[in-house]
UniProtKB/Swiss-Prot annotation:
Pfam families, per database record: LPMO_AA14 (PF22810)
Organism: Hypocrea jecorina (strain QM6a) (Trichoderma reesei)
The protein, known as: AA14 family lytic polysaccharide monooxygenase A
Lineage top rank: taxon: Eukaryota
Cofactor dependence: Cu(2+)
EC number: 1.14.99.-
Length: 286
């Protein structure tokens, strides 16, 4: 379908908007229907809440697991290096659509102060963009990437999908850069499966996010293998109580398939409270 840029683009925003990582190599680029490419799609950003495993896993509830990246695109993960994605509420607010004309410094494409925060002291939740699900940058829960060494996504499981990179205090600005472990080995010929992950810390419904990507590792000579992933545990920053080594993604507040328990009033996240230090996770190997 041919798209023209409308004078006023109706973007998902406010209470109806959320956040996902946009990059070439993502599933559901342009929406779930490969025959009807939508540059204004927000399909990957919608949260997962109280769903059976078969529906929340890989965003099967919206068909994203069956909408692979167009043109065989894949996210490059340089071993020991970094890769960059765009955190946004809508594909139109990224450089993937409309030549990036609606992309700004922030995920909603709008201007905000550098010290953006909610009202009051201490700050309440940010009111002018509830999709951020935070009070300010320091309270943003953190986002993560996980990888499975399977080119057939039907073979990806919680046990072989390993969190390999964590970016603290995100989502925040649109541009987000993640560190890659130096010992990640090469992927199979058909590539690997990756997931972008986020569990907000309050400021809205206690849901979670999981988006799908084809990915491949570059600049590597490593022959190491990933260890089997174990469920993370709440340790509240006490390293002696944390799960060590390779960890599964967080599955929380779903109808089935949950793998974590946290104290009343707490939220699990991709941060030190669940045993993840920021940056590349270099302890994930067998």
């Amino acid at each position: 379908m041919f798209w023209t840029v409308p004078v006023t683009l109706a973007l998902a925003s406010g209470a109806s908007a959320h956040v996902a990582a946009f990059v070439k190599g993502m599933y559901c680029e342009g929406g779930p229907d490969p025959n009807n490419y939508n540059p204004n799609s927000n399909t990957p950003v919608n949260p997962l809440w109280d769903l059976p495993f078969e529906q929340w896993w890989m965003q099967a509830d919206r068909g994203c697991n069956k909408a692979p990246p167009p043109d065989g695109a894949s996210v490059a993960l340089p071993a020991g290096g970094q890769f960059t994605v765009e955190l946004a509420h809508n594909q139109a607010q990224t450089t993937l659509s409309f030549n990036g004309q609606f992309a700004g410094e922030w995920p909603d494409g709008q201007p905000h102060p550098e010290n953006w925060s909610g009202p009051g002291s201490p700050p309440d939740c940010i009111q002018d963009d509830g999709a951020m699900h935070t009070n300010n940058q320091t309270m943003a829960a953190g986002t993560a990437w996980a990888i499975s060494y399977n080119d057939d996504i039907s073979k990806v499981t919680m046990d072989n999908l390993v969190v390999f990179s964590v970016l603290e205090h995100t989502p925040w600005k649109r541009i987000a850069t993640y560190d890659v472990p130096k010992d990640l080995p090469a992927c199979p010929a058909g590539g690997c499966y990756c997931a972008w992950l986020w569990v907000p810390n309050g400021c809205g419904e206690p849901n979670m996010y999981m988006a799908n990507y084809r990915c491949h590792v570059t600049n590597t000579t490593s022959t190491k293998q990933l260890a089997q992933a174990k469920p993370p545990t709440w340790c509240g920053g006490d390293s002696s109580k944390c799960t060590k080594g390779a960890k599964q993604m967080i599955a929380w507040n779903q109808a089935t398939g949950n793998n974590v328990q946290v104290p009343n009033g707490a939220s699990p996240g991709y941060n030190i409270n669940m045993g993840w230090a920021p940056g590349a996770q270099n302890d994930i190997f067998a």
